């Protein structure tokens, strides 16, 4: 079986898809998530390059096709089920790592104006390769979140901020809410543990308000939470603080 995709200016031809694109399409249909027509091919290219680059740098511990499909791609796209993201919205993925959830969201919604921010340059080099292969464009920024969040070119400039990280929710709020303009939202993709109660003080301090706390399950049965924090007022200028204070004295 030959799979060929003409994406942007690059044609990629491979012996067979790495991920089960029929399964992907079926899962997205079951979740009632509409995606761009090239999404399956682009996600397959992403998976192949993720595994290839992972051999020379640590991007992910999940390298099997089903794991990538469900725990990286489906999980990253799930927010589209619960949150209406406006067309052409400005989105920043904070601490993007290997690109999750920001890049799968862009693949599903190429209209988004995406910024991928990370403190490790080599991850951004990997993401440049994937973006080029997919014929997509996103700004890549090599910076620490606590510094970028005080830069006027980025502070309160985004409709949506996203993060998928193991850091506690109060910590994520302090890193991410400063990027969100009033009226926008921070989307935190978290594991099964419900951390919302501990983060309500941080949300209020930073100008946010809990809008949704949605539990959902991946096709594998793994439990997740999507926490949606609406920005209702500007973040005080003292935030975000330095990482040591954020970690040792969380809001």
Residue ranges and their predicted role:
Residues 183-193:
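Conserved beta-strand signature within the Rossmann-like core of class I S-adenosyl-L-methionine
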Residues 19-87, 92, 122-138, 142:
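Class I SAM-dependent transferase core
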Residues 109, 180-182:
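Helix-to-beta-strand junctions that scaffold the AdoMet/dcAdoMet cofactor pocket
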Residues 77-165, 173:
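Conserved SAM/SAH cofactor-binding pocket of Class I
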Residues 50, 105, 127, 190, ...:
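Residue-level signal for inorganic ion chemistry
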Residues 197-251:
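SAM/dcSAM-binding transferase cores
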Residues 1-15:
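Single conserved hydrophobic/aromatic residue that forms the stacking wall/gate
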Residues 146, 168, 191-195:
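Short "lid" loop at the C-terminus of a central beta-strand within the Rossmann-like core
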């Amino acid at each position: 079986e030959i799979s060929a995709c003409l994406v942007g200016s690059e044609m990629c031809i491979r012996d067979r898809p790495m991920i089960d694109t029929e399964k992907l399409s079926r899962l997205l249909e079951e979740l009632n998530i509409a995606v761009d027509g090239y999404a399956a091919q682009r996600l397959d290219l992403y998976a192949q390059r993720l595994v290839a680059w992972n051999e020379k740098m640590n991007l992910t511990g999940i390298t099997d096709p089903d794991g990538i499909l469900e725990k990286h791609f489906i999980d990253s796209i799930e927010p589209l089920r619960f949150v209406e993201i406006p067309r052409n919205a400005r989105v920043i993925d904070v601490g993007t790592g290997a690109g999750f959830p920001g890049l799968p969201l862009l693949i599903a919604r190429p209209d988004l104006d995406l910024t991928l921010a990370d403190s490790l340059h080599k991850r951004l080099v990997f993401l440049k390769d994937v973006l080029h292969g997919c014929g997509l464009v996103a700004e890549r920024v090599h910076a620490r979140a606590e510094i970028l969040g005080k830069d006027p070119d980025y502070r309160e400039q985004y409709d949506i901020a996203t993060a998928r990280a193991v850091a506690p929710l109060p910590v994520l709020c302090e890193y991410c809410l400063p990027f969100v303009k009033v009226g926008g939202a921070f989307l935190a993709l978290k594991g099964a543990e419900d951390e919302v109660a501990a983060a309500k003080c941080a949300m209020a301090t930073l100008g946010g308000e809990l809008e949704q706390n949605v539990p959902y399950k991946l096709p594998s049965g793994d439990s997740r939470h999507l926490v949606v924090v609406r920005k209702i007022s500007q973040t005080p200028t003292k935030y975000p603080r330095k990482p040591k204070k954020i970690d040792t004295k969380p809001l």
